[in-house]
Every structure is written in C-alpha cells, then in structure tokens.
Amino acid sequence: VRSRRQRQMCIRDSLEADKLDSGIYIMVDTLKYLKKGGRVTAAGAAIGTVLGIKPVLQIHGEKLDAFAKTRGVKQAKKKMIAAVRKELEERFQDGDFGKHAYLQSAYTKDEEAALKWKEELMAEFPGMEFQQDPLSLSVACHIGAGALAVAWTHKIDD
C-alpha cells in the first residue's frame, strides 16, 4: 500500500514526464493587454485593432510563443482547430484520438461564446473526452476578456 506522499510523487512524476506531450492554443480577442504587458508595441496594437487581428498564442511545455496572426475570431478558431488536428494526427496515427488524448477548452469572461466554442470543438473531434473551464487568472490577466483556448493532453497510462 502506497502512502499519500508516494501517490503524490507518482502523479507528479507522470505529469512531469508528459508535460511536453500536450498542446495549448489561445486566441486573444484584444491587443490591449498584450500592449500593456509590453508584448506588442502601441503602434502594432493600434494597427492590429483596426485590421481586426486576433493573435493565436501557443504553449508547449513551458514555452509561450506567437503561433499565428489571424483576421477575426472565425479564422482564429479555424487555425486553432487545424493545429490541434495536425498535432493529434502526427502523434496518434490510428486516428482514434479519444483513445489517446483528452480535449479541453477555456475562455475568459464570455460564457456564451465559450459554449459555442465547445460545441464547435465537440463536432470537430467526436469521441474525445472533453472539459471546459475558465482560463486561470494568471493567464487571463495578461490576455484580457474574450479569449478562447483549446488544449489537448495525452492520457496517462495507469
């Protein structure tokens, strides 16, 4: 029988080993907070806002990078779905994504948009276990309201 501490270490070790075997994509709805944080210049934010630019950020492991710049929410959603599909197809050639991975979505503030996003993802990835939650405050304070995200996580073997 394992002690509580041993079980916690086992879980932690599994999560650490699999941290690079997942992907997160976040669509930022407004450039205001990226500008405040110094990630976008004032001129870049002004031009991007006029053009309706929605940046898509990518997190793999511990690294946050710009993934794409899209025009509008619809294009950003398509870009995120395509990126997740590509990653899943590359890692799980049998096509049974639900057997190998979980799908999650997240959002900041706009629950109505989040529910629509969830429905779109469930239609795009049938058979996958799915969860939706608000983005953590540590992320939300840097990207602002209206953000949508999608993530996939490798299932951990027991």
Predicted features and spans:
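Single conserved hydrophobic/aromatic residue that forms the stacking wall/gate
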Residues: V1-S3, R7-I11
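Short glycine- and Lys/Arg-enriched binding-loop motifs that mark or flank ligand-binding interfaces
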Residues: S3, L34, G44, G48, ...
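Helix N-cap and loop-to-helix transition residues
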Residues: Q6-Q8, T41, G72, D110
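Beta-strand segments within the central parallel beta-sheet cores of soluble alpha/beta enzyme folds
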Residues: R12-A17, Y102
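Active-site rim beta-loop-alpha module in soluble metabolic enzymes
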Residues: L15-K77, I81
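Gly/His-enriched, cation/cofactor- and phosphate-binding structural elements
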Residues: I59-D158
